[in-house]
Amino acid sequence: MSDPVMDAYTQAYNSSGNMVQAFGVISESGQVLWQSNNWDLTADASTLMSAVKSRASSVIQNQVKYSTMRSTPESLVARNVQGSGILILTKIDTTSDRWVVAWADAQAQPDGVYVDVDRAAKTLRGKI
């Protein structure tokens, strides 16, 4: 049996042209439920969720500051102005407290990579 989160990560990676390079799932309470082995969300999961809820103008992940480009109650897209990439949070579904967090290469188009991550997140409905 395959890992549904790894499958979603692979989908986002492939559909983004290899731009999505880190992936995780966190709960609204800040619990890390799954993360790819190339980053650690544990220290920042709670503050990431707070940033989404408050529609913060910036968010910090792994000591890197990202400026919020777009924020809704169910998503956040932020870019590091020094070129350290794009951070995306999107809710798996409206009735869940689970969120996908993804990091994409700085060369990615924010709107396009958001769509790739959101589509991958939606495949996780009821699976995590």
Swiss-Prot record:
Keyword Transmembrane helix: no
Molecular functions per Gene Ontology: actin binding
An annotated GO cellular component: cytoskeleton
Cell compartments where the protein resides: Cytoplasm, Cytoskeleton
Superkingdom of the source species: Archaea
Keyword set, alphabetical order: Cytoplasm, Cytoskeleton
Function: Has no profilin activity against rabbit actin.
Family stated for the protein in its record: Belongs to the Asgard profilin family.
Protein's UniProt name: Thor profilin
Protein source organism: Thorarchaeota archaeon (strain AB_25)
Taxonomic placement: Archaea, Promethearchaeati, Candidatus Thorarchaeota
